[in-house]
Amino acid sequence: MKPKIRTPFFETSVKNYIYGDAVLEFAMAADRAAVKHDVDVLFISPYTEIRRIRENCPHLIILAPYMDTLRPGRGMADVLPEAVKAAGADGVVINHCERPMTLSAIKQTIARANELDMLSFCCADTIEEAQAIAQLHPDILNPEPTELIGSGSASDMGYVREAIRAVKAIDPNILVEQAAGITTAQQIYDFIMAGSEAAGSASGVLRSPDPFALLDEMVSCVRRAKDELALRR
């Protein structure tokens, strides 16, 4: 079975800012924050660290940054879905702006993820692209404008609400996240209060003066938003 994600949740990754032991240390900080604030944290791990993070961070939902759609056999240098799953990944990122894919490839990758009970976490550059991908029914959709990723400038609330409405109109079961350009814990809180089921940050955390402290603060804001939304119901 695929992992059951509790909303709202937090998502982060290391991209290529750090590597080796530093990745594990960051993942362990995310794992501690997940436990401390009782929030689900999705962690996009480099391939080389998936198994180590799985063995040391039992509370994280681990995503591979990409996978191919081939099956066991020939295909040297391709990323085999079964191998990613065996290493400990719970899901896979699909169509990130730094690894863009055709709609056909997105469809095939979602199908392979479903076959292996892996979560499909899709990215989209525009609301129109998000609508097209929503037709393929991924588990999670992150409509983040490419120009904002790593820029330090987040999407405005009008875009956030419009993106959520557009995706939910096609498939209300898709979880919608906002993550591009987030640099503060307050932005995490604001996006979730605006209706996003998740928010995340990678560059904003890792380029901050104290990444571990900011990571914990961001996860705490997910918890705060969750508690406040519960009181409104």
Regions found by a protein language model. Give the residues of each.
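Conserved N-terminal beta1-alpha1 strand-loop-helix module at the mouth
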Residues: 1-79, 120, 128-137, 216
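Glycine-rich beta-to-alpha transition loops that act as phosphate-gripper elements at the mouths
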Residues: 65-69, 73-76, 104, 122-127, ...
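Glycine/Thr-rich beta-alpha phosphate-binding loop at enzyme active sites
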Residues: 70-71, 77, 138-165, 174, ...
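Catalytic cores of alpha/beta
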Residues: 79, 124-137, 181-199
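Glycine-rich phosphate-binding active-site loops on the catalytic face of alpha/beta enzymes
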Residues: 90-101, 141-153, 194-215
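C-terminal helical cap(s) of enzyme catalytic domains, especially alpha/beta-barrels
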Residues: 109-115, 155-158, 204-233
